[in-house]
Design a protein with these regions (language model features):
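Recognition helix of helix-turn-helix/homeodomain-like DNA-binding domains
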Residues: 1-10, 35
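Extreme N-terminal leader/targeting regions
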Residues: 6, 10-13, 18, 40
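A solvent-exposed interaction/effector surface
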Residues: 29, 35-214
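DNA major-groove recognition helix of helix-turn-helix/homeodomain DNA-binding modules
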Residues: 14-29
Length: 214
């Protein structure tokens, strides 16, 4: 806490809610800052108790370690490179980031996974406010877009016959069932799928699917 007060470090996002409850203040007041890159919920669609939020999200810069399929001979070697990246590798990249967006969230970025293999990329990233990053840090500029956002709670998990699902498991349901039923198709503006984790152990969080209305 003393390092935080002295400006030597920032609090972990996963502890903010608990700290705010203990101190009986909002998270914004706790940080003494406005949440950066705010997004706007324009509609909520409920299916069997599961909420799917239609979100307008402004342009976002994501930075960290991004692996590009074009640098690999085949899909298997690309997938192996993703799997071989260790937690230490990811944290080493995160520690080099400049001007990280608050609050801090770990994000898995899936680029063009519904397209040809060579057009794909996969990243372990966080939001930042500048493209000027350290050597070895990859940056992806996510355009402003409409997204479908879904959380990994029990009601949503039960839609895919689970009590608790992982974020990535929601993408197929959203793409194959939710979108056709509610007048959406994949966005074609360069926006990408994101897994945004809200716990330190990456057990829960939000699936973001970039879409446009039909």
């Amino acid at each position: 806490m003393s390092k935080w007060e002295n400006g030597e470090c920032l609090p972990d996002v996963y502890n903010l809610k608990l700290l705010a409850q203990i101190l009986h203040i909002s998270v914004d007041s706790l940080l003494d800052t406005e949440i950066q890159n705010p997004e706007k919920i324009v509609e909520t669609i409920t299916i069997g108790g599961a909420n799917f939020e239609i979100v307008e999200k402004p342009e976002t810069l994501l930075a960290g370690k991004i692996i590009y399929a074009k640098n690999f001979a085949n899909e298997d070697s690309f997938n192996s490179a993703i799997d071989s990246l260790t937690e230490d590798d990811k944290q080493a990249a995160f520690e080099k980031l400049k001007e990280t967006v608050l609050p801090i969230y770990d994000i898995n970025l899936s680029v063009n996974f519904w397209l040809n293999f060579k057009q794909r990329a996969y990243g372990f990233v966080r939001g930042v406010t500048t493209e000027e990053q350290s050597d070895g840090i990859d940056v992806y500029k996510m355009p402003a877009s409409l997204f479908i956002r879904a959380y990994t709670d029990k009601a949503t998990s039960q839609l895919i016959s689970k009590e608790q699902c992982e974020i990535w498991e929601l993408f197929a349901y959203i793409r194959d069932y939710f979108m056709p039923s509610h007048g959406f198709k994949m966005a074609e503006n360069g926006a990408q799928e994101m897994e945004v984790f809200d716990t330190f152990d990456h057990k829960t969080g939000y699936a973001y699917m970039p879409v446009e209305r039909i």
